[in-house]
């Protein structure tokens, strides 16, 4: 059997054949994962493929897509201009669109353009995508099918020879995902398709793998002043189309993810050992699911320019170690477990967007990608029974087939260093790794001393937690546990939610608050560096994260439900056996200025600028400002955590899992006395947050046109107001998106209902320029000021904005369905239970009834308040 034409394919063949499972059916001589039952596929009489997805998580809405396997380079007589022109023409006026452009038809029913507009043309495909179309009226569905078929039928009436040759119905697929009945939709499309005759399909260019025997080095300009970046990319041959729906891509993707985790961790460790500060270390890979060309694996490292030569040596030495088979077996086992645990958590979160379904179906049509659910893939991958030694051998085979200092390698770097020197430094360090001696100190669970517990019976007050339908246990010390029982994939999730955030730290500089969480782990925990402690618990299947916000601190994670003793011991050790690690702090603070420079100009910085204009005197911002980072922050953070962890009764430990409550309580109770408590509760500091009144506008010059608008208004956060605010944000998003259609701008609307320091509704609109290629030929990119005029027209009319009852009802269904799905996520319950205990807010109890009571008038009332609140506009006009 021909599997692939290089050593990489041979390296993967063995694990593929070893991993047969009952969840698969056999095809193409390799096991095929069972397709998602929610996806109905077929071929219409005229040859057009179809994919219909019934998605119960999104009510009243659907995504419509048309996928064509014609792009800018996969047909014999194409050019990028021809393919793009054909795509834009398809969004214009067609015979069945009643004299208006296709994009206007979909926009009139709520369709929102993506970041590429309504269409994207790639090397091998053209993908039209209309997001969030409101389909509550049956005639909308019928009209949408007619329009899509009209787009398919252009081939039969086109005078353009390019269109008539390369856009046959058989070269196209219609995808519908949303609140639809798949069987009914398929039948309707079949009836309509009889109006469109089949046309012969022309053959496409075949993929050809081109091996490179020597590396290419490219010197590129610096993107950020003073920061030099080194990127190594290995091109890999594609997975043959016949095997794309088999288990091979899933296995290969897992191995590449593990390879990236290994390289990233080893590079970071190497840079730290040599005291080389870094701005970024990341690995990535592109598979045949994501591209029509070669697959690839990449490593990127960004450092200060004067450290660049040394960083190149570290990167090459790490890559050489992995190539020569020096990956540690315990490191690989830990990373595999972490990777699978992350995937299992995603399975518990069943809120699949229509867009995700559209992408999966498009990949199936274009590349023969698998239609299997994530759960099916995870069950298969987690069900593998391979010894760690076998896993390591297979990993080493794949790694050595990919990594090479010359073959199929392209290096791009941005530093004032001659190419020959870069190449020599890289090659020499790689070769040096052949004699690597691993003297790394690796800790294990045996290095974590278990806690000595007193088996003393205590009286526990038990009552029902009505919001979660769980149990609340209160111990004599005042320590509280809330347990929510639900399916959790064999895990026990925990969240120690405490009153006390960075606003309680005295003399905190503006821009320091966002750093506080990191200092929890810039310590030694249980006698070892915190980083090593986290590796030890990760190897045992446990995670632990810390997030300190403005007024609360959350210490959360998960562990195997059969390992509760390890979970509780490790949590308590992390809380009370911490010591400041001066070396870790010093290195961290040397990296932060570089990371800050790398963040410059990003979306977070833009949001921070707008918020700073809105409330200039507010110093408790979450955005990180390295220039404000003081040497005293480490001690302040240490003292802060020591203080709040002595008052754990001023909070709640939330547990979410599927153990019998009596068994859990018996197991957990001996550990409760180890949590320190106090008779004095935490006092929230007085934090002044008063946005400037009125409407302010700031204009600057930049690289590309963009608009950011922030709006803030006081709002009593009752459950009724919370639901109405959610619906109002959806209405505003729809109205703005509709108004902006044809301007060439892409809208992102975010909002938050803020409880502290005062109850408010905050909205943020971000408009970014999209290429005209993503819209109809009638679309001409508006300038920033023209787009701003459109936004102002909508926002200035919020007091009297037209709000249809149809939209409100659809969005109510959408909100209800979204909350129902979120409740299957353990983190949802940890968040809402902590909010009720720490902030006294409950938006979950009777949520269905609360949503039902939202009216058009209530939504208008929320929008009217926005008209009265604070507004800031930040406009960037391209130079």
Predicted regions and their residues:
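N-terminal secretory signal peptides that target proteins for export/translocation
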Residues: 1-9
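Well-ordered alpha-helical segments embedded in enzymatic catalytic cores
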Residues: 394, 636-640, 788, 858
């Amino acid at each position: 059997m021909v599997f692939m034409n290089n050593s990489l394919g041979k390296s993967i063949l063995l694990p593929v054949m070893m991993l047969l499972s009952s969840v698969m059916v056999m095809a193409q001589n390799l096991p095929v994962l069972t397709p998602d039952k929610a996806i109905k596929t077929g071929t219409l009489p005229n040859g057009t493929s179809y994919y219909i997805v019934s998605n119960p998580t999104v009510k009243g809405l659907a995504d419509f897509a048309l996928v064509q396997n014609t792009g800018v380079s996969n047909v014999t007589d194409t050019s990028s201009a021809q393919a793009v022109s054909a795509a834009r023409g398809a969004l214009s006026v067609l015979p069945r669109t009643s004299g208006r452009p296709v994009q206007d038809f979909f926009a009139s029913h709520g369709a929102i353009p993506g970041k590429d507009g309504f269409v994207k043309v790639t090397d091998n495909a053209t993908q039209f995508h209309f997001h969030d179309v409101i389909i509550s009226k049956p005639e909308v569905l019928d009209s949408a099918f007619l329009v899509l078929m009209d787009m398919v039928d252009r081939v039969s009436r086109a005078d353009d020879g390019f269109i008539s040759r390369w856009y046959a119905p058989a070269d196209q697929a219609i995808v519908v995902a949303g609140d639809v009945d798949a069987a009914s939709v398929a039948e309707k499309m079949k009836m309509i398709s009889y109006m469109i005759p089949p046309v012969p399909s022309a053959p496409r260019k075949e993929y050809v793998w081109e091996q490179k025997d020597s590396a290419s080095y490219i010197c590129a300009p610096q993107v950020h002043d003073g920061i030099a970046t080194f990127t190594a990319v290995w091109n890999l041959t594609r997975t043959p189309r016949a095997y794309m729906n088999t288990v091979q891509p899933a296995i290969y993707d897992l191995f590449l993810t593990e390879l990236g985790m290994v390289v990233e961790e080893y590079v970071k460790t190497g840079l730290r050992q040599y005291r080389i500060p870094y701005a970024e270390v990341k690995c990535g890979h592109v598979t045949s699911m994501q591209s029509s060309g070669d697959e690839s694996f990449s490593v990127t490292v960004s450092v200060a320019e004067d450290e660049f030569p040394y960083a190149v040596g570290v990167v090459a030495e790490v890559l050489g170690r992995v190539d020569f088979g020096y990956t540690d077996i315990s490191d690989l086992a830990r990373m595999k477990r972490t990777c699978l645990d992350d995937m299992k958590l995603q399975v518990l979160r069943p809120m699949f967007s229509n867009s995700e379904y559209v992408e999966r179906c498009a990949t199936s049509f274009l590349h023969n990608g698998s239609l299997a659910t994530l759960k099916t893939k995870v069950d298969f991958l987690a069900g593998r029974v391979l010894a760690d030694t076998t896993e390591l051998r297979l990993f080493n085979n794949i790694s050595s087939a990919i990594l090479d200092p010359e073959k199929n390698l392209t290096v791009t770097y941005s530093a004032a260093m001659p190419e020959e020197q870069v190449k020599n430094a890289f090659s020499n360090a790689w070769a040096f790794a052949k004699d690597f001696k691993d003297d790394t100190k690796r800790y294990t669970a045996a290095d974590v001393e278990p806690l000595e517990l007193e088996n003393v019976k205590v009286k526990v007050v038990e009552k029902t937690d009505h919001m979660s339908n769980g149990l609340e246990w209160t111990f004599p010390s005042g320590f509280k546990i809330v347990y929510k029982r639900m399916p959790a994939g064999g895990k026990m999730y925990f969240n120690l939610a405490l009153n006390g955030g960075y606003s309680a730290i005295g003399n905190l500089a503006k821009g320091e608050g966002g750093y506080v969480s990191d200092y929890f782990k810039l310590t030694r925990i249980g006698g070892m560096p915190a980083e090593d402690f986290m590796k030890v618990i990760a190897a045992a299947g446990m995670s632990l994260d810390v997030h300190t916000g403005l007024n609360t601190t959350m210490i959360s994670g998960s562990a195997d439900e059969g390992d509760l003793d390890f979970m509780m011991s490790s949590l308590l050790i992390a809380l009370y056996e911490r010591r400041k690690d001066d070396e870790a702090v010093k290195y961290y603070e040397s990296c932060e200025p570089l990371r800050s420079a790398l963040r410059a100009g990003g979306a977070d910085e833009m949001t921070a600028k707008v918020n700073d204009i809105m409330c200039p005197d507010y110093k408790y911002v979450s955005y990180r400002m390295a220039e404000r980072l003081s040497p005293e922050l480490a001690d302040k953070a240490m003292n802060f955590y020591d203080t709040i962890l002595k008052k754990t009764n001023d909070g709640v430990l939330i547990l979410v899992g599927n153990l019998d409550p009596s068994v859990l309580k018996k197991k957990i109770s001996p550990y409760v006395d180890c949590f320190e408590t106090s008779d004095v509760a935490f006092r929230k500091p007085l934090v002044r947050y008063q946005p400037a009144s009125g409407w302010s506008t700031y204009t600057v010059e930049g690289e590309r046109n963009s608009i950011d608008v922030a709006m803030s208004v006081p709002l009593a956060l009752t459950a009724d107001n919370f639901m109405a605010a959610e619906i109002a944000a959806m209405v505003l998003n729809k109205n703005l998106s509709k108004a902006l259609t044809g301007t060439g701008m892409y809208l992102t609307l975010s909002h938050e209902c803020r409880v502290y320091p005062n109850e408010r509704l905050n909205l943020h609109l971000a408009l970014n320029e999209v290429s005209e290629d993503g819209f109809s030929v009638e679309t001409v990119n508006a300038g920033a000021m023209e787009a701003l005029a459109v936004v102002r027209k909508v926002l200035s009319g919020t007091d009297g904005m037209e709000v249809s009852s149809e939209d409100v009802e659809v969005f109510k269904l959408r909100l209800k369905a979204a909350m129902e799905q979120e409740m299957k996520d353990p983190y949802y319950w940890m968040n809402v239970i902590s909010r009720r205990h720490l902030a006294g807010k409950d938006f979950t109890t009777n949520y269905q009834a609360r949503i039902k009571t939202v009216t058009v008038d209530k939504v208008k009332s929320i929008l009217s308040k926005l008209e009265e609140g604070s507004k800031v506009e930040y406009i960037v006009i391209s130079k």
